Amino acid sequence: MSQETGNDNRPQTNVRPGRSRAALAIRAIANRIRTELYFLLRARFVKRKGMVRIPWSVELWSPHNDISLGDRVQFGPGCIVNCDAQIGDSVLFARNVALVGRDDHRIDLPGVLIWDAPRGDSHKTFIGRDVWIGHVAIFVAGVHIGDGAVVAAGSVVVKDVPPYTVVGGNPAKVIKKRFEGLSAQ
């Protein structure tokens, strides 16, 4: 089995120079404890399939306590999930990504103040596997994000995103296919 080497012919690793493997192991244990405490104290209703990395600053809330997370999901600091959501395996959220409700307040009731209006219908958001979401992206509830998609920083996603595409903008539009000329698997 061959291993890639760096410029100085040493095997490449994810360990930063000057950082010991023991320090990384201790940090990994501390992260696992922090994650378990997060779900125990703040988000018992969330269903998890496997490893999740979640900073304390992330807010998970759902009108029907219906959030499920796949294996290897990582949230950046300040992310917000305020809708029912199903998130697949191997999904990366950058900082301050928001999944927000679509009909949190009914605005179509004459004579009823928005403050007093009941909640509208709830829409579940689906994020496929192997998805990368950039800094400060916003998703309106009810969208489906296909497997392998990349959402650029600052995007506002109001429509479904096809698999293996890169989208960006406000509203988000397809920028390109991830694997031009290849059949994605």
Locations of regions flagged by a protein language model:
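Short, highly charged low-complexity linear segments
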Residues: G6-N14, P110-A117, A152-K159
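C-terminal/domain-terminus segments
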Residues: G142-G168, A172, G181-Q185
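Secondary-structure boundary/capping motif
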Residues: K49-G50, G70-D71, G128-R129, V136, ...
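Extended, small-residue-rich solenoid/repeat segments and analogous flexible loops
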Residues: G6-P63
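Amphipathic terminal alpha-helices
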Residues: S2-E4
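Flexible, glycine/small-residue-enriched loop-and-beta-strand segment within the central core
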Residues: W56-L69, Q74-H144, N170-P171, K177-A184
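Hydrophobic transmembrane signal anchors and adjacent membrane-proximal interface regions, especially
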Residues: P11-V15, A43, L92, V131, ...
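Generic structural signal for short, solvent-exposed loop/turn connectors between secondary structure elements
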Residues: Y38-M51, G78-I87, Q185
